[in-house]
Amino acid sequence: MTELLSSIEMNLLPVNCKFSEEQKEVIYENNSIDVVAGPGTGKTTVLTARIKMLFEEVNGSRKGICVLTHTNVAVDEIKSGLRKLGIDEIKRPHFIGTIQDFFNTFFAKKAFHLLLKDKKMRVVDDDIFREKFHKVFNLRKPGFYREDRSLPNPENKKIEWNFNDTQQFASVVGIKNPQYKKAFDGSINFLFSKGIITNKCCLELSNWYIERYKEVFRAVIPRRFSHLLLDEAQDTSVLQFNLISALFDDEKVTIQKFGDPYQAIYNIWGGDTDLAWEIDDSKERRISQTSRFGEPIVNIVKNVCIKTYEDLTSNSKHESFPPYFIIYDNGDDLLSKYSSLIEELESTNESFKLSQKLKVIASVRHKDLEDTFGDKYKRENMKKLTRNSYLDLFLSVLLKKLSKKFDEDFEDNLKKFQNRMQIFEIIKALIEDENEKLKDGLRTLLDELVTNEEFSVDKDGLCTEIIESLKITFSLELESQSSESEEYEYSNIKLCTVHSTKGETHKATLLMLDTTFTPDYRKDSLSYHIVELLKNCFHDEYVELPEKKNEKEIESEKARKLAYVALSRPTHLVCIGIPNNQIENEPTLIQDLLDTGWKQYTDQDVI
């Protein structure tokens, strides 16, 4: 085992680096545990090392390891680490994938076909489902439904599923008008009968199917998997945990959960903000030494955490600066000051200057960034277009157009190698403006994809519609890439939401404090500015939130969770940006910050 660990360290860690004692304790642990890993403590690296250890342990047996996480990016990161350790392909009996893919593939599909036999199941994004729902609801809506009234959003309604009732699988909760409810229920059930469902529905199907054959699965699963490793456990929903508990008998399968409970931000806008991950104190293991940032940032992160985090310490080689705050008038002023601060600090610190990591301004909502930076902030145009992103862009346009017109599932065919090669030829013709080649290539591809008779009636019309949409989408992307440096003087600073920074490491991060929190979005609700909600976190002493919280304290907890994620991203420089118009509301704030070690940057000198 010692030799294996040395080999893992050599291939997975930076030169001359070793796993810490608390990391090794987790890597070697063979019992069920809850691993609480702080920001920058090497959670994914430890998880990858643990997987390698287990693969070696079960080699030659018929049992596999099941690894579940929440995003394809996380899956790719784990697989990339395993390739460094000589594992190029994940084969049965092992499984590494997203939790949603696991339930969709092994349970939801089987449940669906049990109910609707050979009907094709199509799992669509929420926005596509909403469009299809609107089209169906529009035909069924009651006579009193005004034309100028917006159509309902199915994502915002609670739907009860009863797959034992073959007459009506779905029933919306909370709609009292019987005609409205009939139209809503009828629309959802019609789409289900056509095989058009969402990921949320897949979990409900899985739940029904697992309950139906629970004892069989609990007997079979331990024969297939010896271990379940659950990554990002803090983002796992109550229903997902219930499904895992129903499937995996924890007396026969070792279950090891990894995550940071303080980074649970995906559910903060919903009604249920409680953490679904119930950490067992007797099984808890902590990885609390961060190598991402130094003690100045550690102290900031500890102070915004929703719970006391005394054991978070730094063993980082990075020399983190003291925290800075910037008072700004508008977006240009903030960009100018932040950019100047970075330049000044780069002139004093070689490691900061040489770092190629991101420089970021993050805010809670897209709208905050749009209001502050205007056209400089483009939600979709912050990434460089690569060969793969060209492909993603093309597939996004094509699938949306086809999904609106036909009920077929095109994704599997589009994954075929020969179709991918065709698509790259079409993209090339699109970029080089070779219209005839573009049209011929698209017609050939559509002939292979679409079997619906309606297609032959208006083939040219559909081709023209898709080409127009492709040209608009690609021209916007290409234009944004070519002109971004001209429009945006500080193009090396990324503008984004806090949610999109999760999992990233930056050289410098500024959290823009210009968001208003309104509980439940009720018209009569009081609103709380983020500066008001976080000001207690800028004191020397940690201020704990009470167990029973009033409305303002609930919003403060949300703000702290978001600040914790944002302010734990950088290696060297952490900042906050405060709008000038908030200073008069908080007259002591500047002095409070200065008294607790924050430095103010005014773009003339460092105070």
PLM regions and their residue ranges:
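The feature marks helicase ATPase cores and/or their adjacent C-terminal helical subdomains
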Residues: M1-I607
